[in-house]
Amino acid sequence: MAKNTVSARFRKVDVDEYDENKFVDEEEAGEGQQGPDEGEVDSAIRGGNMMGALQAVLKNPPINTKNQSAKDQAEHLVLKVLISFKANEIEKAVQSLDKNSMDLLMKYIYKGFESPSDNSSAVLLQWHEKALAVAGVGSIVRVLTARKTV
């Protein structure tokens, strides 16, 4: 038989601390992320440096923030850059991106598909075709299963 004790020390252990599925709000980590620098992106577009504009717009994504206006502004800025590209420059731009930037680009492409504007769907389909050819199906799987959205 078990020994009857009056001790309550076992109740001081927080078992939820060791649960890997426990939700942890990461809002504090994303406070500094307000999205890409709009001035830098606009100056690159005006200067004709489309590769620089693409790199700048993918540089500081508002992934860890819950600020929806920052996410919408970043989405609008990315869409503006993608539309500014000529059709024959898209493949070269996609090939210049690394794996993380490619996944981020795919996130923005799918986000653009959620709310299509005038001719954005055609441009996004061109970008999706080129990105899929370079990154493969794995990029789509990573985007669709990611918990952090843009």
UniProtKB/Swiss-Prot annotation:
Q: Give the Gene Ontology MF terms in alphabetical order.
A: actin filament binding
InterPro entries named in the record: ARPC5, ARPC5_sf
The identity of this protein, by name, is Actin-related protein 2/3 complex subunit 5-C
Please report which protein family the annotation says this sequence is part of.
Answer: Belongs to the ARPC5 family.
Function per UniProt: Component of the Arp2/3 complex, a multiprotein complex that mediates actin polymerization upon stimulation by nucleation-promoting factor (NPF). The Arp2/3 complex mediates the formation of branched actin networks in the cytoplasm, providing the force for cell motility. In addition to its role in the cytoplasmic cytoskeleton, the Arp2/3 complex also promotes actin polymerization in the nucleus, thereby regulating gene transcription and repair of damaged DNA.
Task: Write out the annotated subcellular location.
Answer: Cytoplasm, Cytoskeleton; Cell projection; Nucleus
Identify the SUPFAM superfamilies for this entry: Arp2/3 complex 16 kDa subunit ARPC5
Keywords per UniProt = Actin-binding, Cell projection, Cytoplasm, Cytoskeleton, Nucleus
Q: List the disulfide bonds.
A: none
